[in-house]
C-alpha cells in the first residue's frame, strides 16, 4: 500500500464507520470493515510517521492515565429550569412572550446520560471535558476519541464547542451488566450511571468496549455565529454528528405540546433513555438579550416526563446519622425496578414526615423517581393494610453510639461529637471538593481508616503515616504516598475553605467566603451581634456559628496550628470604576488570571464566567474568541489588558 492509497483507504474506513455508528445505516459488512481496518493498522505499524490522526484506528490509546486533569469550559454549561406539566409550560412560554411576542422555539429530546463538551479548533478535536460544576470539568479526551460517533475532525475552521450527552443504548446496557455479572463485578444501576462510569475510565481500552454514543444537544463557544438554534442543530449534523431525533421547530404553545406528546409516546420504544424535552428560544440574538439567572438560562427549559410511579413494601427502617448529628430514617424496600434502576431504599426525610403521611412498617407504598432525583415515598396504600403493619417509633438513643437523642423542632439529633457516624461524616465533608479537596480521601477510605483506629477525629488525618497506610488491605506505596501528599497539600489553604470544611451547620461555601473576607481568623471569636451585621446572615446562622466555636474551641485551635490557613482580608475600594460591576475575563492575559481576579475583587467587582446583557466589562487578552465577539454584539464595554490596567490604577 502506498501512502496515497493509505490516505484513500482511511477516508473509505471513516465513511464506513460514519454510516455504521452515526447513521445506523451500514454500507459494508462487518467482515469488510474489519479487513480494511487491519490492512490500515498494518500499514501504520510499518509507517508510524505517516499516520493520519483522524484514522479510526487512532481512537484508542495504549497507555492508561494515572488521573484526570481539570479543564475550564470556554462557555459555562448551565443547568436548565424544569417544567413538569402543561400549566407550567404555558407560564414559562408566556414569560418569553412578554419580551418576544413572536418568539419561535426549537424542541429536542433530553437524553439521560453524561454531558460532554467537545472543543474543536481548526477543525480538529482538541479536548473533551465532562460537565463538572458547569465551569470546570474533567478532561476525558482519551476516552471521547474511542466513541465512534464523535468526529476527530470536522469541516469547520472556527473555534467551536459541541455539546451533547454520552449515552448507552438500553440493549447494550443489558449486555454490559450480563458481562459484569459473569465476572462477579458490581452491576451498574442504570444506563446513565454506566455511561458516566465508562467516560471516567483511566484506561481508554475499557471505555472503547462499552459501545458509548454521543448525542449532540447544543453549542457552547461559537453559538453567537448562528442566527437560529434550529440552524445550529442542522449544522452539527452536517459536520458529521448523529442527527438529532424528534427535532421540532415550534411556533406556538400548542405545537410545543404536540412535539412533547410525540416524544413521550415514543419514550419506551426509543433505544436510548429519555427523560424529557428541551425547549429553546430559537433566535440566538434574543437568547443573549434575555440572559441568565444565577443558575440557569432564561431562554430554555426542560419539559420533564412525569415521574414513574411504582409500589413496593417497606421491609424495615434504618437510621442514618449525618455529620451534624441529624438522624434520617430510610425505608428499606422490597426491590423494585423503576426506569432501569433497581430501587431498594428511599428516604423518609424525618419522623414528622412519617407521622404526617401515616407511613407504617409493612405498608405497601407509592414510590416515584424522576431522572437523577432520589426515590421518594409519596404515600402509603392504606386500603391494602391487613393489620400486620406497625407504627414506626421515634428512636430515643443514637443507633451508632447509643447516646440519648435530642428532639429539636422536626429533627432528632445525636449530640455526641465523638459518635462514630458523626466523626466519619465530618471527615468525609472535611476532605470534600468544596472543602479542603483532599484527593483520594473518600467515604470508603475514611471508613477503612476509622475501622482500623487510625483516625478518631479530623485532626488525626494529619498524623497519618505511609507505614500505617501500607498495613491496610489494597494499599501500595504509590497510593499511600499520593494520599499523604494530598493531605499535606492542604497546609496553607484559603481560610474560607477551612471554615467550610469544619461543617458548621447553616454555614456553607458562600457564607464561609464572606466570613473569611470580613473577619479573617477573628471569625472564631465573634459575638452574635458581629455576625448579624454581615449582609445575608440571620439568627439561625449566627447562633450556629457561635455555638460551634464555643463547643469546638480546642479542636479549632489545634487545626489552625497544623493547617495555617491563608488569610486574605478583602479591602474594598468603592471609588473605583469597577466597583459593583460584573466582569468577564477572556483570552490569554500576561498576568496570572487569579491575580487579576483578586485585584478586581479588591475593587468590589463581581467576576462572571459568561457574557450576558448584565455584563458591564469584558477584559480580553490574546486569542479572546467567542466571548469577545458576544460582548461586541451586545455593545458591552471591552478593554484590552493595557486599557484595563490604566482604568484600575486611576
From Swiss-Prot:
EC number: 6.5.1.2
Annotated keywords: DNA damage, DNA repair, DNA replication, Ligase, Magnesium, Manganese, Metal-binding, NAD, Zinc
PROSITE patterns linked to this entry: BRCT, DNA_LIGASE_N1, DNA_LIGASE_N2
GO function terms (MF aspect): DNA ligase (NAD+) activity; metal ion binding
Residue sites binding Zn(2+) per the record: 398, 401, 414, 419
Binding annotation for NAD(+): 30-34, 79-80, 131, 165, 304
Stored InterPro entries: BRCT_dom, BRCT_dom_sf, DisA/LigA_HHH, DNA_ligase, DNA_ligase_AS, DNA_ligase_CS, DNAligase_adenylation, DNAligase_N
Keyword presence, Lipid metabolism: no
Gene Ontology CC: cytosol
Residues of the active site: 110 (n6-amp-lysine intermediate)
GO biological-process terms attached to the record: DNA repair; DNA replication
Domain BRCT: 573-650
Reaction equation(s) it catalyzes: NAD(+) + (deoxyribonucleotide)n-3'-hydroxyl + 5'-phospho-(deoxyribonucleotide)m = (deoxyribonucleotide)n+m + AMP + beta-nicotinamide D-nucleotide
Required co-factors: Mg(2+); Mn(2+)
NCBIfam families: dnlj, PRK07956.1
Biological function: DNA ligase that catalyzes the formation of phosphodiester linkages between 5'-phosphoryl and 3'-hydroxyl groups in double-stranded DNA using NAD as a coenzyme and as the energy source for the reaction. It is essential for DNA replication and repair of damaged DNA.
Family recorded in the similarity comment: Belongs to the NAD-dependent DNA ligase family. LigA subfamily.
Name the record gives this protein: DNA ligase
Gene (name only): ligA
Amino acid at each position: 500500500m502506498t501512502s496515497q492509497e493509505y490516505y484513500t483507504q482511511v477516508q473509505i474506513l471513516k465513511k464506513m464507520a460514519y454510516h455504521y455508528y452515526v447513521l445506523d445505516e451500514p454500507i459494508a459488512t462487518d467482515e469488510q470493515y474489519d479487513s480494511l481496518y487491519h490492512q490500515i493498522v498494518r500499514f501504520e505499524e510499518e509507517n508510524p510517521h505517516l499516520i493520519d490522526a483522524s484514522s479510526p484506528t487512532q481512537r484508542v490509546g495504549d497507555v492508561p492515565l494515572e488521573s484526570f486533569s481539570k479543564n475550564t469550559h470556554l462557555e459555562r454549561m448551565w443547568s436548565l429550569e424544569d417544567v413538569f406539566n402543561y400549566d407550567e409550560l404555558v407560564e414559562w412560554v408566556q414569560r418569553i412572550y412578554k419580551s418576544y411576542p413572536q418568539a419561535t422555539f426549537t424542541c429536542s429530546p433530553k437524553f439521560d446520560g453524561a454531558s460532554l463538551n467537545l472543543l474543536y479548533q481548526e477543525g480538529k478535536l482538541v479536548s473533551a471535558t465532562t460537565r463538572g460544576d458547569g465551569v470546570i470539568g474533567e478532561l476525558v479526551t482519551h476516552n471521547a476519541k474511542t466513541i465512534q460517533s464523535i468526529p476527530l475532525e470536522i469541516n469547520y475552521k472556527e473555534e467551536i464547542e459541541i455539546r451533547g450527552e454520552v449515552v448507552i443504548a438500553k440493549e447494550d446496557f443489558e449486555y454490559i451488566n450480563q458481562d459484569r455479572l459473569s465476572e462477579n463485578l458490581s452491576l451498574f444501576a442504570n444506563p446513565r450511571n454506566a455511561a458516566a462510569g465508562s467516560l471516567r475510565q483511566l484506561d481508554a481500552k475499557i471505555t472503547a468496549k462499552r459501545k458509548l454514543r454521543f448525542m449532540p444537544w447544543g453549542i457552547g463557544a461559537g453559538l453567537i455565529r448562528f442566527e437560529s438554534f434550529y440552524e445550529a442543530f442542522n449544522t452539527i449534523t452536517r459536520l458529521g454528528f448523529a442527527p438529532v431525533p424528534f427535532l421540532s421547530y415550534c411556533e406556538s404553545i400548542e405545537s410545543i405540546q404536540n412535539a412533547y406528546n410525540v416524544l413521550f409516546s415514543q419514550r419506551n420504544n426509543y433505544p436510548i433513555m429519555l427523560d424529557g424535552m428541551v425547549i429553546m428560544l430559537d433566535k440566538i440574538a434574543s437568547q443573549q438579550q434575555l440572559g441568565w439567572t444565577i443558575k440557569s438560562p432564561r431562554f430554555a427549559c426542560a419539559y420533564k416526563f412525569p415521574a414513574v410511579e411504582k409500589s413496593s413494601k417497606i421491609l424495615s427502617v434504618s437510621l442514618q446519622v449525618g455529620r451534624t448529628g441529624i438522624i434520617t430514617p430510610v425505608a428499606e424496600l422490597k426491590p423494585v425496578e423503576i426506569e432501569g434502576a433497581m430501587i431498594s431504599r428511599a428516604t423518609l426525610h424525618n419522623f414528622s414526615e412519617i407521622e404526617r403521611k401515616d407511613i407504617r412498617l409493612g405498608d405497601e407504598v407509592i414510590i416515584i423517581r424522576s431522572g437523577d432525583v432520589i426515590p421518594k415515598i409519596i404515600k402509603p396504600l392504606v386500603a391494602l393494610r391487613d393489620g400486620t403493619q406497625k407504627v414506626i417509633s421515634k428512636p430515643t438513643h443514637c443507633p451508632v453510639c447509643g447516646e440519648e437523642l435530642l428532639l429539636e423542632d422536626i429533627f432528632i439529633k445525636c449530640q455526641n461529637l465523638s459518635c462514630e457516624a458523626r466523626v466519619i461524616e465530618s471527615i468525609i465533608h472535611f476532605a470534600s471538593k468544596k472543602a479542603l479537596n483532599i484527593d483520594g480521601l473518600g467515604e470508603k477510605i475514611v471508613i477503612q481508616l476509622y475501622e482500623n483506629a487510625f483516625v478518631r477525629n479530623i485532626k488525626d488525618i494529619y498524623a497519618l503515616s505511609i507505614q500505617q497506610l501500607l498495613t491496610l488491605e489494597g494499599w501500595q506505596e504509590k497510593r499511600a504516598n499520593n494520599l499523604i501528599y494530598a493531605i499535606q497539600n492542604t497546609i496553607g489553604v484559603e481560610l474560607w475553605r477551612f471554615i467550610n470544611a469544619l461543617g458548621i451547620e447553616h454555614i456553607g461555601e458562600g457564607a464561609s467566603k464572606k466570613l473569611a473576607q470580613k473577619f479573617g481568623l477573628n471569625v472564631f471569636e465573634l459575638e452574635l451581634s458581629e455576625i448579624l451585621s454581615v449582609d445575608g446572615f440571620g439568627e439561625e446562622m449566627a447562633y450556629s456559628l457561635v455555638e460551634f466555636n464555643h463547643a469546638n474551641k480546642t479542636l479549632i485551635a489545634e487545626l489552625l496550628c497544623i493547617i495555617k490557613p491563608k488569610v486574605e482580608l478583602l479591602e474594598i475600594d468603592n471609588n473605583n470604576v469597577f466597583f459593583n460591576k460584573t466582569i468577564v475575563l477572556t483570552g490569554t492575559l500576561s498576568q496570572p488570571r487569579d491575580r487579576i481576579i483578586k485585584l478586581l475583587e479588591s475593587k468590589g467587582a463581581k467576576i462572571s464566567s459568561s457574557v450576558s446583557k448584565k455584563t458591564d466589562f469584558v477584559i480580553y487578552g490574546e486569542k479572546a474568541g467567542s466571548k469577545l465577539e458576544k460582548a461586541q454584539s451586545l455593545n458591552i464595554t471591552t478593554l484590552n489588558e493595557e486599557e484595563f490596567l490604566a482604568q484600575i490604577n486611576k
